[in-house]
């Protein structure tokens, strides 16, 4: 089938969420992709930071094949060994306390926001408690994740969003400090902002935000969905700063496309 035929079929059948490039990929090996015309590409996108182990990795393929032949799915009503082992490994490399599995990065953000809300509820905070997020951030496109994404272009078509989200300037500690109050239950931010460039938190900033959260008994929630799983050099970017979040989200390269 010709490339244009695939594109025509996609335009007819698939909801348009991106302005796609006119390329139809067929398969990949390592860091290279191949389209339906046989053209080879060196892939610097990695499926938007997903394919951390590359394409057609034998260890990944064999692990998926082995598990699919045994048990492809079981609900959270029961235990299963792979989930337990994965949770233990994540705790070992992160030194966090518990693991909550979701289906995607944006769903992980939704889970983090629910943790913040439940935290405020358990503290007996008034219903108008606030969450501080960062301008120029990106946390996902579901309703809650979009509410803490500091970009009017993404937010405006879906207003009204979750209320009581305050936006500070990334790497501007005074901006964050000015928003803190007795209503603040959490701060959510990326350790390295990845929307429109690569902007790491400064050490002064991230340590200062950690101190503000401690002072006000608020949660520090770090989004490592794009920068985590070794992409910064450390397993998680926050580990290079000598701080530890109360909540961390990770995804993308965690699953390598599976």
Task: For each feature predicted by the language model, list its residue ranges.
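Conserved N-terminal phosphate-binding loop of PLP-dependent enzymes in the Aspartate aminotransferase
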Residues: 1-258
């Amino acid at each position: 089938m010709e490339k244009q035929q695939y594109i025509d079929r996609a335009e007819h059948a698939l909801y348009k969420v991106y302005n796609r490039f006119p390329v139809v990929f067929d398969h990949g090996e390592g860091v290279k992709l191949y389209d339906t015309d046989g053209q080879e590409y060196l892939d610097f996108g990695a499926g938007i930071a997903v394919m951390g182990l590359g394409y057609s990795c034998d260890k990944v393929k064999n692990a998926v094949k082995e598990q699919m032949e045994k048990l492809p799915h079981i609900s959270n009503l029961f235990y299963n060994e792979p989930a337990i082992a994965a949770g233990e490994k994540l705790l070992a490399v992160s030194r966090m306390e518990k693991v909550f599995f979701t289906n995607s990065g944006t769903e992980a953000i939704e889970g983090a926001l629910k943790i913040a809300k439940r935290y405020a509820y358990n503290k007996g905070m008034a219903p108008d408690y606030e969450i501080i997020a960062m301008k120029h951030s990106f946390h996902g496109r579901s309703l809650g994740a979009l509410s803490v994404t500091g970009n009017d272009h993404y937010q405006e078509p879906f207003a009204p969003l979750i209320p009581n989200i305050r936006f500070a300037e990334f790497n501007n500690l005074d901006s964050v400090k000015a928003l803190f109050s007795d209503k603040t239950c959490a701060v959510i931010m990326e350790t390295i902002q990845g929307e429109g460039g690569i902007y790491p938190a400064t050490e002064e900033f991230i340590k200062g935000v950690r101190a503000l959260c401690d002072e006000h008994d608020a949660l520090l929630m770090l989004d490592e969905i794009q920068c985590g799983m070794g992409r910064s050099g450390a397993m998680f970017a926050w580990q290079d700063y000598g701080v530890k979040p109360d909540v961390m989200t990770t995804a993308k390269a965690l699953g390598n496309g599976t």
